[in-house]
Amino acid sequence: MSFGLTNTPAYFMNMMNKVFMEFLDKFIMVFIDDILVYSKNEDEHKEHLRLVLEKLREHQLYAKFSKCEFWLKEVGFLGHVIFGEGIAVDPTKVVSVTKWVAPTSVEEIRSFLGLAGYHRRFIENFSKIAKPMTKLLKKDAKFKWTEECEASFQELKKRLVIAPVLILPDQRKEYHVYCDASRRGLGAVIMQEGRVVSYASRQLKPHELNYATRHLELAAAVHALKTWRHFLIRNHYEVYKD
């Protein structure tokens, strides 16, 4: 099937997920034709590579050797850099964000927030910081780039530059989820052994503006549990709130 056809990526992604179903989230990640194999040590990695290559051969799928990289200690994948210590924002993506000039239209705001938002899990309270700009995305909002918008814009760029390295979660260890809520939005962080796995945040929905504080705190906890359910299901965790 030609990659020029509209449905080809979705079809191929579905096929690859079926081929590697038994290995997904155990030692392999797949995005269309990119296959990432990860392991704890070299012996384990050797076995994982054998299983993956045998599975490809079994389904008559062949990898081009010149486009393969093996035994890497650090790898760029979907805008991130993954290595032994954790996961970081790809520096090349950070450079493109820092060079962004102040938006002059709603479309440019949407483009910037789309790019910055892809890395929102690295930024504490992303939604609160972005709020002055997201207000301009409302249907009847008049575009006016204020000092508050400029401060929001510059703060997000700065946060991406200094974004922390997030640890890779260990499903054998306990999770700790910390939640925060205010009239400015909901925020949460999930951690293991005092180190950040991911941040999450969102702005309040119109009806939530009338919530009592205790209900906002509950909404923050619900948002966190939904966001990270793939980490928390079948695992022990504790939730903390102010």
Task: Walk through the language-model features, giving the residues of each.
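Short loop/turn segments at strand-loop or loop-helix junctions that form parts
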Residues: 242
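Retroelement reverse transcriptase polymerase core
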Residues: 1-239
